[in-house]
Design a protein with these regions (language model features):
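Walker A (P-loop) phosphate-binding motif
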Residues: 1-8, 12, 16-19, 68-116
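Active-site beta-alpha connecting loops in nucleotide-dependent enzymes
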Residues: 4-17, 21, 25, 162-165, ...
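Switch II (G3) loop of P-loop NTPases
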Residues: 129-142
Length: 266
């Protein structure tokens, strides 16, 4: 597939270009002359204006034009799409999930909005069954809706909702595929109300902060097998860990295996 990206400084899209290069014929930004009738998809970065010369040229040629959110859906529509959403904790939960999948050498595609430690922002392989997407609420330049409403996930997790953004997240919940799974932090009162009042036909899975205790400067996770020392600390991190655990269990990692992997997470 021949794809052109108009990135305008969006580093996450530049990473996507690099990830797709071994599989597709891709180009990035450049001049108007690069927009030709042979291009099969033009992907627009979140900060690109409709007056951008390349966007206008693509429209003049009648080329398929996608926001990057819509393109990610098209790219992964035959895979199980997993979205981590929420106004805080997205990247932390994503990091825990990716650490666990890597620990057990499980293949998973992913797309992150910003770097997490040494983890690249994007990975793509045609063989992976799952794709994990960090679902931010930046406005799409084409659809004029928050980007995370374009992914149509089968499995989603919402960590927290900032006051005033309830409608955005209610609309997001309605974009999950029917019969899909919604994991949500039930300690967030507004989120709990949204999840439990949705009319979408979903399997609801609430989670809460993982039981733990602090001793001698170390956090110990309380598990069915006893206390386990961790390399992370703090109640928020324990809440994120709980969400990551349930997400991993829905990706085929059982509870005991998750504990084995998360013990080395930092």
């Amino acid at each position: 597939m021949k794809i052109h990206f108009i990135t305008e400084g969006a580093s996450c899209l530049s990473s996507l270009v690099a990830a797709l290069s071994p599989v597709h014929e891709v180009s990035e930004s450049g001049s108007v002359s690069e927009i030709s009738p042979s291009i099969e998809a033009v992907v627009i970065g979140e900060h690109v204006s409709p007056t951008h010369p390349q966007w206008q040229q693509a429209q003049a040629l009648g080329l398929p034009i996608y926001s990057y959110g819509a393109f990610l859906y098209e790219l992964h529509k035959m895979k199980t799409r997993v979205v981590i959403a929420g106004t805080q904790g997205r990247s932390e939960i994503a990091a825990m999930v990716l650490h666990t999948m890597d620990y057990f050498s499980k293949k998973i595609d992913y797309f992150l909005e910003s770097p997490i430690g040494n983890i690249p922002t994007c990975k793509y392989s045609p063989e992976a069954e799952f794709v994990l997407i960090e679902g931010g609420d930046t406005l799409s330049p084409i659809e004029q809706v928050p980007m995370f409403q374009l992914y149509r996930p089968t499995l989603a997790l919402i960590s927290h909702i900032e006051s005033g953004k309830e409608k955005q997240y209610a609309d997001f919940i309605n974009t999950l595929t029917k019969g899909g799974i919604l994991l949500y932090n039930e300690e967030d009162a507004a989120l709990k109300v949204l999840a439990e009042s949705t009319e979408n036909q979903l399997r609801l899975m609430p989670y809460e902060t993982a039981p733990h205790q602090e001793s001698g400067g170390t956090t110990y996770l309380i598990t069915p097998e006893g206390e386990m020392p961790l390399m992370i600390s703090g109640k928020e991190q324990m809440n994120y860990l709980s969400g990551a655990k349930w997400l991993c269990q829905n990706l085929g990692i059982d509870e005991q295996d998750f504990y084995e992997a998360i013990e080395t997470f930092k």
